[in-house]
Amino acid sequence: MQTILGANGQIAIELARELRSRHTGELRLVSRHPRKVHDADVLAPADLLDAAQAIAAVRGSSIVYFTAGLPPDTRLWETQFPVMLENALQASRAAGAKFAYFDNTYMYPQDARLLTEDTPFAPVGPKGRVRAAMASRVLEEMARGDIPVVIGRAPEFYGPGQTQSVTNALVIDSLKAGRLPRVPVRDDTLRTLIWTPDASRALAALGNAPDAYGKTWHLPCCDDRPTYRQFAVMACEAFGRKPSHTVLRRWMMTAAGLFSPQAREIRELLPRYEQDQLFDSTRFKQRFPAFEVTPYRQGLEAIRRESP
């Protein structure tokens, strides 16, 4: 039995598809209100803030995937994320299950250096500090050695379905709504974005590769690294629109935070959009040379095909 904690998000949905397709016939989906991806999926309603519920949800699992998310609310991140993670780790230990942790890059420096698995944590802002503390806790569990632990880390998303990211919200959702795509802060910095189905496929590969445990892995991304201007052009072309976009300058996004709680919550991330974001996934590609990374144009065309 392989179990996904936080089973309703886009990463978890694609992960469930990949696990069922390639790795296991027994799949359990855990969240407060889980929904089946396949008819044969086992649903386990549970609140990960409750340690007893987490233990019950994980019991009998061989591999546990932590893909749980929260709304971009600093208070929720500070008060709930650490508890959810700790309960998930304790439940996995009680079950003797392997633990695969899906991570982001909020703990990294917000500058133009090439990010590798060895880049030291230097979080900017409260959400970055939360994610740094969570990643450090998982590394502690990895070093403890009671259960096998692996970390799969992804940069900013773009993707199909209900993918949630700044890029999806400003570029892709704008095009879906018939508006000009918007890009945050600057359009001339290089971006590394990950196609969400690739992230899920890669996490499944790590979880089912015994030699992957005990390490952190950057999940595989296309190395073309377009600027936001180039990405917006590709997105417009995929949607059959004349290439054009607007830039939301930093002062505009900062001002928006005075009136919008959602805009206020992303202000700590704005420095990363002033710099190139260079995310290196060489380690994964060398270990899994047959893994096919989705090119940006192919991903954008897939999004267009699913759009009404």
Residue ranges and their predicted role:
Residues 2, 202-265, 281, 292-308:
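Mid/C-terminal beta-alpha module of Rossmann-like enzyme folds, strongest
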Residues 5, 30, 67-68, 99-104, ...:
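SDR active-site strand-loop-helix element
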Residues 35-95:
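NAD(P)H-binding glycine-rich loop region in Rossmannoid oxidoreductase-like domains
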Residues 86-131:
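Conserved Rossmann-fold NAD(P)-dependent oxidoreductase catalytic core, especially the SDR/UDP-sugar
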